[in-house]
């Protein structure tokens, strides 16, 4: 077992049983290709999502260090911040969130609904900033201030995307390989690529467990030139933690995130509506809608390595739908 070193790292069990891996019959008929979906949108806490896999490792480390406060950062409609706040509530910890308004909107629905509404329910302390220009440095400044107030803070990076958090998606690759074994030979895997931890963790895990499958990251905020070093650096950091080699090429498509992070586009919204109407599954306008737009266009443009089955990693995000009305 090449991933045996995973068990060396403390981990809290938030998810329990594997999330479903499902065939999408009506969507497959529509696209003329076998499409499967990994349902990380239905993880148990706070309306689900992929960040819970990372938080199993990060929160365990926070408790090991004796922290009483989790500090993290993201957009006003950040799924990661919402899930971090929920984990803090479950563990009896304080949570401080440094938020930015990445789309510069004054729309009350965006500023108060969706994920932002849930932060208040979790009793999160909100700190606003003009922009997360250097989030790691900004989080350290905030942590110093919180510590001076008598708390013991633990900083979780944007998206939970460091080598420790990304182990959650090495673990996910193991889960996927076990679910596919003897059932389906996945040719291609598609995932949204943002803060890069999910993408990099899958890259390390799938290289060792499903080496014949190509992994495509559809960017949601950056060009390939800007995103590639982020994914590669995390890929190598994860491999170092696990004492593995990681030589798989990182594949990125950056044609689907315009006009920018957090701003809906027509292709992404059409993908959201399509999956809702054909399969009753909810995507979101920021991450999974744009990633699914890439999958759909990738089939029509013959961008995949062959015509075999495709697995879409559903990372969650549906709470943001409420904040993006009337785009939806």
UniProtKB/Swiss-Prot annotation:
Keyword DNA repair: no
Residues modified to N6-(pyridoxal phosphate)lysine: 51
Organism: Escherichia coli O6:H1 (strain CFT073 / ATCC 700928 / UPEC)
Single annotated GO MF: D-cysteine desulfhydrase activity
Essential cofactor(s): pyridoxal 5'-phosphate
HAMAP family per UniProt: D_Cys_desulfhydr
Matches recorded under InterPro entries: ACCD_DCysDesulf, D-Cys_desShydrase, D_Cys_desulphydr_bac, TrpB-like_PALP, TrpB-like_PALP_sf
Subunit structure, as described in the record: Homodimer.
Catalytic activity: D-cysteine + H2O = hydrogen sulfide + pyruvate + NH4(+) + H(+)
Family to which this protein belongs: Belongs to the ACC deaminase/D-cysteine desulfhydrase family.
UniProt keyword annotation of Lyase present: yes
Name of this chain's protein: D-cysteine desulfhydrase
EC number: 4.4.1.15
Swiss-Prot/TrEMBL GO biological process terms: D-amino acid metabolic process
Superkingdom of this protein's organism: Bacteria
